Structure formats: structure tokens, C-alpha cells
């Protein structure tokens, strides 16, 4: 099993290298998409995140958290799906992590030689956003690193979350980078090496790897350029620090603190040697400490399962929200 995890690590790590950051002059970009889709910024001051709101301002609340180096645009199809439902009003809160996809790094900036956390402070800020805006136990959906943030939010602020959906993420990525018995402490040297390599990699190497990685993360060719652009306009050191944090953080001991109904949807690892059965076993073992968790594999999809094709993902999302 752990051989499978170690092999999976190489596949997973290949999807995470990011392009060199490009300077931005505003709190976040993609404003042209906002104008087209009608969302507006939330009234919330933070140097870790900013939030876009779509849909019915009197509707039920759902928070969408994108993954590493991704923008809120990754959820546009999901937003369209939710807001088009007859008889169901949704107020959709999309998180944009500072330093990702054109947003200035601000509080997530990496200013020293040693990396500082990104995901954990973002989870705390989302909890503050929920509290200060009096959101009544919103549903939370997180993709990849966004799933990690969702787990942190639900475990560390259990009264804040009504239900949780994690998309293609396990609670301890570090298990994929070491032998049986790997712990957060024992994998720390590996995580530190990843930080150094990714934070200092030349732009050309990042661009080349990002292009190859997107081909494995998204099956639908027409959707790849958006993800590539998000990566290209992300702060390289923020992305590197966030990935290092994912490797070095073991959330398995915290899973029992989660009280919200939780579903984890995932796809088979993108390699013929990683069978659906091996993938299932990895997820079952990883989430064994979360009582009542529902695990669902989405077949014929890729890491960004909201794209490839989206109908299966929407079906699972609708089922989670209907419970």
C-alpha cells in the first residue's frame, strides 16, 4: 500500500509546480469575468483572502475554495449550475487566496528564507468571514488544497460548517513521500527540500512543468489554458510554501473533531498502474479517522473533476447539498 502511496507521490507532485509570479496592482484580477457574471466583492477586510459573491443574496450559503495556485474562475461552471436551479436559491461565496492567480501576496507573502504557512491562516480567515458575516453554517466545498483548507476549517472551527465536500485530496500528503509510518516530523526534511526547489526554480522550468502538469490534471483541452494562466500569474514562493505546508501537515488526528457531514469525491490516480482499487484503498485508509465520511470515486475524470465532464461532479454536489 505504501509503495502505491510513494508512487502516487511522484504523480501528485508533478501537478504542483508553478510558474513565476507576475506583479499585480490590485487586490485581485479576473475583474472582467466578474463583470460578465455579475458577482461582487464581499465586504470583508483581509490580507489573506478576498471573497466574491454570486447568486441569490437571500439564498442558502455555500463557500467554494479553489486549489493550489487556482482562481475563483475554476468554480464558474459550478456557480452557473447552482444559480440555475429552480426553487433553490444559493448565495455563493468564492474564495481567492492572496498570492494565487494574480492576487497580490499581501499577508501570504514569503519574505524570509524559511516558509510560513498559507493554508492554515486562510482557514482561520474563512472562519472569521463566516462569523463576521453571520453565515448560518454554510456548506463548504474545497478542491485539492482547497479541500485541505476545508478540513482545517471543519476540524478547527466545527461550529462554522454545515456540511463539507472535499474534492480529490487526502488529509496527509506526506504519507505519499515516505515509507510506512511516515509522520509530519519525519517528512519535514522532504517538505523543506520541496520548498527550496520550487521557490528557487527558474521561470522557464516552471512554465514547462506547469504545461505538462495541466495536461494530466484536466482532460478537456479547452479548459487547460485558464488553469495555466492561473499558475503563471501566481506568486511562485507563495505556491511553494503552500505545497510544502500540504506535505508537512497531517490532519488525520484532527478528523474526529469534524462534526459536519462530509463527503470526499476523488478520481483514480492518473496512471494505469494505479488501479481504481488501489485508489479506493488509499482514500479509505486516509479517512479512516472520520466517522460517517462518504467516499465517492468519480470515474472517467481527472484531478479537476469539475471540468471532466462536470455532470458527475454536479450530481455528487447536488446530493451532498440535499442531505
Model segments located where?
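Catalytic histidine-centered segment of alpha/beta-hydrolase-like enzymes
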Residues: 301-310, 314
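Active-site loop/oxyanion-hole signature of alpha/beta-hydrolase fold enzymes
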Residues: 38, 44-48, 91-141, 145
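Bacterial N-terminal signal peptides
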Residues: 6-15
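Flexible "cap/lid" loop of the alpha/beta hydrolase fold
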Residues: 164-200
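Conserved alpha/beta-hydrolase catalytic His-Asp/Glu region
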Residues: 175-182, 197-256
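Conserved HGGG/HGGXW glycine-rich cap/lid loop of the alpha/beta-hydrolase fold
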Residues: 54-106
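Conserved hydrolase catalytic core segment
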Residues: 136-178
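Conserved loop-alpha-helix segment in the C-terminal half of the alpha/beta-hydrolase fold
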Residues: 261-301
